[in-house]
Amino acid sequence: MAKLTVKDVDLKGKKVLVRVDFNVPVKDGVITNDNRITAALPTIKYIIEHGGRAVLFSHLGRVKEEADKKGKSLAPVAADLAKKLVQEVVFPGVTRGEQLEAAINALKNGEVLLVENTRFEDVDGKKESKNDPELGKYWASLGDGIFVNDAFGTAHRAHASNVGISANVDKAVAGFLLENEIAYIQEAVDNPVRPFIAILGGSKVSDKIGVIENLLKKADKVLIGGGMTYTFLKAQGIEIGDSLVEEDKLDIAKDLLAKANGKLILPVDSKEANAFADYTEVKDTEGAAVDPGFLGLDIGPKSIAKFDDELTGAKTVVWNGPMGVFENPDFQAGTIGVMDAIVKQPGVKSIIGGGDSAAAAINLGRADKFSWISTGGGASMELLEGKVLPGLAALTEK
């Protein structure tokens, strides 16, 4: 990566501004998944161990009006982070003003402060989300000219707390998490060890058109699963029963299939049910077609075997999107089968592109078997599409 990283700057005695991604699920004041906090620890620890004074910024959820602030404070995150660091995390509970400035100026080397939810600034004119220049300048003024972006999950957004601060400091550098995310995902797409196989699932073709187009150019094969399977099948004239379909995307699906030159591999059977929720019958289809009155909710056993075969010998695998409704035990065999097929390949670099795939790997006990699990669903999708991420582009060149 041709950008400066946190290792390239002198941190001692400096108030170092750090954008982290602490957008974690909080229920009744309790954090239910702390993965993103844990992922930020190496960068935070590096800064404080090298004598920096870490001033952390993060958003939590969406905040559009005053009422949305309820339950969106970063207070529980500050408490959790303090436990993980085994030291106090100063939390003034505001996003600007004298109280915040005094607390930052009182920091000593090796101390940590967390600014309140940056999206609280969205209540009055979306200042954070629309990258208000004055807000970016103000937040930048709270530090000593160094900004560390370690929030891959928001790198595809141009917000005041990443791009805005970057524009107003001497050096904007990447943290370890951001550096690793780019190294794994971009390297996999731009310079993969081959065979390189991409696996795309999820419900909608519309969400993945750009990704499919880019990966058809880069990968040796692209395997398709999940709900979007049925738009591709219908585009080929195959009966899909009551399965999910995007009628307005059938022509795009046909076009992608025509351009793919055999690289796009579709399921050859499905696990179908006679309703999405209150079903009374679940069975495997004979072939690719789904029976009338049924809908496909997972890839079937023949498809699992086919995908296992296609993955044999793969050296780079990027997976984004589950194969079925994995939250339901009746429809998780496809996702489990594909995960197991990926991780058993000798010497494979296996990457999960965040979002539902990451949740599936964690919930189904396979997370530790992958080379890398991205912390940013949207950002990893845009990297897979070949897009430039604003948060990354704003960093200082080496």
UniProtKB/Swiss-Prot annotation:
Keywords associated with the record: ATP-binding, Cytoplasm, Glycolysis, Kinase, Nucleotide-binding, Transferase
InterPro entries attached to this UniProt entry: Phosphoglycerate_kinase, Phosphoglycerate_kinase_CS, Phosphoglycerate_kinase_N, Phosphoglycerate_kinase_sf
PROSITE patterns named in the record: PGLYCERATE_KINASE
Stored Pfam families: PGK
Keyword Magnesium assigned: no
Classification via PANTHER family: PHOSPHOGLYCERATE KINASE, PHOSPHOGLYCERATE KINASE 1, CHLOROPLASTIC-RELATED
Name this protein carries in UniProt: Phosphoglycerate kinase
Provenance organism: Streptococcus mutans serotype c (strain ATCC 700610 / UA159)
Lineage, top ranks: Bacteria, Bacillati, Bacillota, Bacilli, Lactobacillales
